[in-house]
Design a protein with these regions (language model features):
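Second-shell loop/turn segments in exported
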Residues: 37-45, 78-87
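Conserved hydrophobic/aromatic pocket- or pore-lining residues that grip, position, or stack substrates
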Residues: 54-58, 89, 100
Length: 178
């Protein structure tokens, strides 16, 4: 009956234990990341401009389409992603968080899991993805579990999809006459 989880088998006692595997790989990113973040945002005036510049940089890196499970849940260090100019979706998310943190922007990596009755009934294989911000995930957060790397629930800011347009039509006694 669709994508309904019937049985969960995990080598981890909790979601928090599973996420420790990811969290342990996010080391102190050091001088390389800090210098790059400063260089990329040198002309920016606002926090939003800085975030946008860093996002453009990270999105401009090459993509490696391997999933977390295909990489054995291994993330390369941020400096290695910078040096190689490519990364998996998860590595690029970790790099974006590191770059933002390096210039004092509060950023955290978040994880998405299928929603389960037992909040701890999910291991690494159930991890849908890692991200800093994701409007697509924000749209469906009522149907999935979004947590920080300590497995604490996170509520994402919903984006409005309302499109508004106003046209003004001026009608006079000469309208339509030739």
């Amino acid at each position: 009956a669709g994508n309904i989880q019937a049985v969960v088998a995990s080598t981890y006692a909790s979601k928090a234990d599973a996420l420790k595997v990811i969290k342990q790989q996010l080391e102190n990113n050091g001088k390389d990341v800090s210098e790059l973040a400063q260089k990329l945002t040198a002309g920016a005036q606002t926090t939003e401009q800085k975030k946008d510049l860093l996002t453009v940089y990270v999105e401009g890196l090459g993509n490696c389409s391997l999933t977390l499970s295909q990489t054995g849940y291994r993330l390369r260090p941020a400096f290695e992603v910078i040096r190689s100019a490519y990364g998996t979706e998860a590595e690029k998310a970790a790099l974006l968080a590191a770059l933002q943190q390096a210039i004092g922007i509060r950023a955290e990596l978040k994880a998405a899991f299928p929603k389960t009755e037992d909040k701890d009934a999910a291991g690494l294989a159930a991890l849908s993805g890692l991200f800093v911000t994701n409007n697509g995930v924000a749209d469906i957060q009522d149907f999935i579990s979004v947590v920080d790397l300590n497995a604490q629930p996170v509520a994402l800011k919903k984006v409005t999809h309302v499109i508004s347009r106003t046209d003004t039509l001026r009608v006079s006694d000469k309208t339509g006459k030739m």
